[in-house]
Amino acid sequence: MRRIIIAAIAAAVVSACSSIDCPVQNSVYTNYALYKSDGGVDTLRDTLSVLTPTASGRDTLVFNRGVGLTSFSLPISYVNPCDTFFFGLKPQGDNTEWIIDRVVVNKTNEPRFESVDCQVAYFHNITSVEVTHNFIDSIVINNPKVDYDTERKHFRIYFSPRQ
């Protein structure tokens, strides 16, 4: 009888412990890879910054002064059906103006329930992308599924030919 009581107590203690593994950072990001018009990987020679408008009407800087990159990541909103970004490119040289392209990412949002103890995470499915063509020739959706995978490239950006 004593062994049964000890076994029951041990089972209760072990089952009371849980290992809930909530992600520390449950934000997801979209990854952009840069390509030349011939399909080869491109390296950003000029300075790139990206802003996004907020609900209050102000702009928020989400990527600042990237140079020498072949790829970069941007956050994506949780529940908005589309995200608007303003890509600003400052060509090399002291007296050059910023060139601005507007990029709109249309998407569906998929709430993901992981545990009662964790916040709801949102994954996304990219449905389309629109771009003005000031310095970006085109943006192609490479992989529409946005989740915790940080290695997956979601977009391929093809720049207009540069001098």
Report each predicted region and the residues it spans.
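A sequence/structural signal for flexible, mid-protein segments enriched
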Residues: 37, 49, 59, 113-117
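Sec-dependent bacterial lipoprotein signal peptides
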Residues: 1-17
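Generic detector of solvent-exposed, compositionally biased contiguous segments
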Residues: 3-5, 66-69, 131-135, 139-140
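Generic detector of short, locally flexible boundary/turn motifs and exposed helical patches
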Residues: 14-17, 50-54, 121-122
